[in-house]
């Protein structure tokens, strides 16, 4: 038997670890919950456990309970790392608390930039759909430009090309899509034909013809009178 509440919290911590090792997350959550609610836990230990509990709630898709643990942890944490801020921003977004998600992401971005670091990809990534849903296309374009600069992915280039197109920045759209095309990341007939039409619009018919010719050779574009 445990002789003190402190010893009991250590036993619960061990049982939580064993439960986790056996892939029993509900069991681990049950023991971690006892620790954070116990008067026998040291404050620092309680704080660390609260963070773990929040992560486990998130892993079991109990997002409301997860963000509450993160909020209680953040109130007393000496340092809130970028990974924790990102997790909180993602939880707010899942819970449709979009303003809080944006605010948390902005803090994470500002803290990174203040240290001369590149912000985590997830902060910008999270903000794109929120601003898009709010029709703030200028902000979406700005975020995508940062993403292609620091975390270049073809999906970001394609999204950026689409944003340029919606703003009638035709040359910028052409350049963005060309980056994707030249790296073999346009794989549908619609995308490749759109690329060719962009070059026609830019009055470069020879390049457009070459793109269509290659598309047919690669069996992406159907050989038809319409496409010849």
Whereabouts are the PLM-identified features?
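Structural motif corresponding to the intra-repeat A-B loop/turn of tetratricopeptide repeats
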Residues: 22, 60, 95, 134, ...
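Conserved small-residue packing positions in alpha-helical repeats and bundles
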Residues: 16, 54, 89, 128, ...
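Solenoid-like repeat scaffolds
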Residues: 2-4, 36-43, 71-79, 107-117, ...
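Post-signal peptide N-terminal segment of secreted/secretory-pathway proteins
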Residues: 1-74
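Residue at a conserved register position within TPR or TPR-like alpha-solenoid repeats
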Residues: 19, 57, 92, 131, ...
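Generic helix N-cap/helix-start motif at coil->alpha-helix transitions
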Residues: 5-12, 42-52, 77-87, 115-125, ...
